[in-house]
Curated annotation (Swiss-Prot):
The lineage of its organism: Bacteria, Pseudomonadati, Bacteroidota, Flavobacteriia, Flavobacteriales. Catalyzes the reversible phosphorylation of UMP to UDP. The keyword Lyase does not apply. This is Uridylate kinase. The gene is pyrH. Pathway: Pyrimidine metabolism; CTP biosynthesis via de novo pathway; UDP from UMP (UMPK route): step 1/1. GO terms for molecular function: ATP binding; UMP kinase activity. Its EC number is 2.7.4.22.
Length: 235
């Protein structure tokens, strides 16, 4: 087993499947099966999920909404997604705990680092909702922060493309994929992996990031067990 403890970052949009908005139950079930395959191998799994399938604070601000208010709405969206994923995982017989960075005690535990680590040690999947609990920070930043706090070995960023390319492969067929790239080269080449705050935090704490296609069955297990899938970013 290559990694003992991973943090999986999923975007809210990933939960939409082929829909334009909201949550696709079939996609949720697929992701739950992928996560179960990793848990069954003894890997400790934490998850941070975005809220863009429901609401984005930045989008609200661009239409005149107060940015802080919008970000708070986005945080609540991540909790909704967390509850949906928790339900799907529990349907797959995986013990799961949802912790929130904002107090919402009726539906989620408050984020307590030691408690989160204890859940992981007991084989439970821990979903972190509510972002960082602060406006102006993305869920990418929340993912890196939580990964550092729980001492994860790696951040696995599940996307709809199979790694990092020289340019957007959905727009440029000539784009080529990197198997490995350094943090420094990502910055030099102006490649978009995460927002700058999240990426810098990961670099400073020497926390590797692997970007991979979450929608290809079996990929999560391959990445977690050390197979070369996607693009690895490290020092």
């Amino acid at each position: 087993m290559h990694y003992e403890r991973i943090l999986l970052k999923l975007s809210g949009e990933a939960l939409m499947g082929n829909r334009q908005y909201g949550i696709d139950p079939e996609r949720l079930a697929e992701y739950a099966a992928e996560i179960k395959s990793v848990v069954d191998k003894g890997v400790e799994v934490a998850i941070v999920i975005g809220g863009g399938n429901i609401f984005r604070g930045v989008a609200g601000a661009s239409r005149g909404m107060d940015r802080v208010q919008g970000d708070h709405m986005g945080m609540l969206a991540t909790v909704i997604n967390g509850l949906a994923l928790q339900s799907a995982l529990e349907d797959a017989n995986i013990q799961t705990r949802l912790q929130s960075a904002i107090k919402i005690n009726e539906v989620a535990e408050p984020f307590i680092r030691r408690k989160a680590i204890r859940h992981l040690e007991k084989g439970r999947v821990v979903i972190f909702g509510g972002g960082t609990g602060n406006p102006y920070f993305t869920t990418d930043s929340a993912a890196v922060l939580r990964a550092i706090e729980i001492k994860a070995d790696v951040i696995l960023k599940g996307t709809r493309v199979d790694g990092i390319y020289t340019s957007d492969p959905e727009k440029n067929k000539e784009a080529t994929k990197f198997d490995f790239i350094t943090f420094e080269d990502v910055i030099k080449k102006g490649l978009k992996v995460m927002d700058t705050t999240a990426f810098t935090l990961s670099q400073e704490n020497e926390l590797p990031i692997i970007v991979f296609d979450m929608n290809k069955p079996g990929n999560l297990l391959k990445v977690a067990t050390g197979e070369r899938v996607g693009t690895k970013v490290n020092l």
